[in-house]
């Protein structure tokens, strides 16, 4: 699946099409483009001239921020008792790590990552509760179905994250911070879609949310982590067979 595709039939079209292709691929939500250059165009000759593409009239890579949506999202965040953040690669691609960290710390909301969002918040951060999805941690996966507000930031609700959509976070109101309109309501319905780059959106909403803590709610994640340590991690570190396990090797390296 590509963001855009084009067939070139004349060699003279190559510079303008390539400039357009790079602009589309790198702007907004980055993604692949396909350029099909016919054999005739490959063997043709022309006077080469290249001009960088800086915009396309029919293509708006970054939606404008809607103040109404930002205000509605801020109100929901301020009133939530058990809010939960899931962030993805959009935070990293949007260079929004600092804005995201400020948002998490001011709101006091526990946050979990999809595999491509990992680096946006240090894993040792007290509000980083682990990874979601089929390869993720026990607590974040279980408590997705217990939160009253699910805040998705720069992630697309992939099936490796959600599992069965028929039972995924049905109890929660969903806020979706997203740059690509095609991703909103595609897999999980967003009660409050917040369109725009997450860097800009988080910077704007930061002044509207309260300084908050969610101690009892965060304790639930700690409880599940203890269960995971006892039933999964400790078991892996203390095998009944001979030889080192992967878990033991990792622990030895960490020490």
Label the model's feature ranges:
Residues 225-255:
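Active-site diphosphate/adenylate-binding microenvironment
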Residues 14-16, 89-96, 242-244:
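Active-site glycine- and acidic-residue-rich loops that bind
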Residues 65, 72-150, 252-255:
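Anionic-ligand anchoring segments at beta-strand to alpha-helix junctions in alpha/beta enzyme folds, i.e.
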Residues 20, 24-79, 233:
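Conformationally flexible catalytic loops at phosphate/diphosphate-handling active centers
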Residues 1-3, 47-58, 120-124, 225-237:
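Gly-rich Lys/Arg/Thr-decorated short loops/hinges at beta-loop-alpha junctions or inter-strand turns
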Residues 22-24, 50-52, 96-108, 165-170, ...:
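Short, solvent-exposed amphipathic alpha-helical segments in soluble enzyme
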Residues 1-17, 39, 117-223:
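Glycine-rich, acidic loop regions that bind phosphate or pyrophosphate groups
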